[in-house]
Regions:
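C-terminal and inter-domain tail/linker signature
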Residues: 1-142
Length: 142
C-alpha cells in the first residue's frame, strides 16, 4: 500500500467514514489493542459505532510511516475528546471536553489484495486530561 493510500484511510477515519473499513480491511481482519480484540469488518464497525464515535471525537495523526510492502508500521498520535458527560464509555465515566491522548506504534499486516489483515497496537503512553486540566498517565486502558 502506498503511503498516500494509507493517509487517505486516516483522512476518512478522521471524518468517521466507516465505509473506509470496507475499502481497507480484509473480511477476516484481526485487531489487537491492549486486551481489546475483535475480528472482521463488522467487528471494527461495531467498535467505532458503539464504543467510540457516539462518545468521543477521535482524531488520528501519523507523524511517521514505514512499509516493506507486506507490513506497515506507523507512529500514531490519537486525541479523543468527550462529546458529552457519560457514565459509561470504553474508558469509564467522562465529562464533556475531557481528553485522552494515545502515543504508540501500530503494525499492520497486509493480505495479497493490500488490505489490513492483522493490526497490532503498542502503547508508549495513554494520558487522561480532566476538565480541570489535571493529567494522569493511564497505562493500557483496556
Amino acid at each position: 500500500m502506498r503511503e498516500a493510500d494509507f493517509r487517505e484511510y486516516i483522512r476518512r477515519f478522521n471524518e468517521e467514514d466507516d465505509t473506509a473499513f470496507d475499502d481497507y480491511l480484509a473480511a477476516d481482519m484481526h485487531m489487537r489493542n491492549g486486551t481489546l480484540e475483535y475480528t472482521g469488518i463488522d467487528g471494527m464497525k461495531h467498535h467505532y459505532r458503539v464504543n467510540i464515535w457516539p462518545h468521543f471525537v477521535e482524531r488520528l495523526e501519523v507523524p511517521a510511516y514505514v512499509s516493506d510492502g507486506t507490513h506497515i508500521g506507523i507512529k500514531m498520535l490519537t486525541h479523543f475528546t468527550a462529546r458529552r458527560d457519560s457514565e459509561e464509555t470504553i474508558f469509564g465515566p467522562v465529562k464533556a471536553g475531557e481528553t485522552f491522548d494515545f502515543d504508540g506504534i501500530i503494525m499492520y499486516e497486509l493480505d495479497r489484495e493490500g488490505k489490513f489483515v492483522d493490526i497490532q497496537v503498542a502503547y508508549n503512553a495513554f494520558i487522561f486530561t480532566s476538565a480541570l486540566g489535571e493529567r494522569h498517565d493511564l497505562g493500557i486502558p483496556h
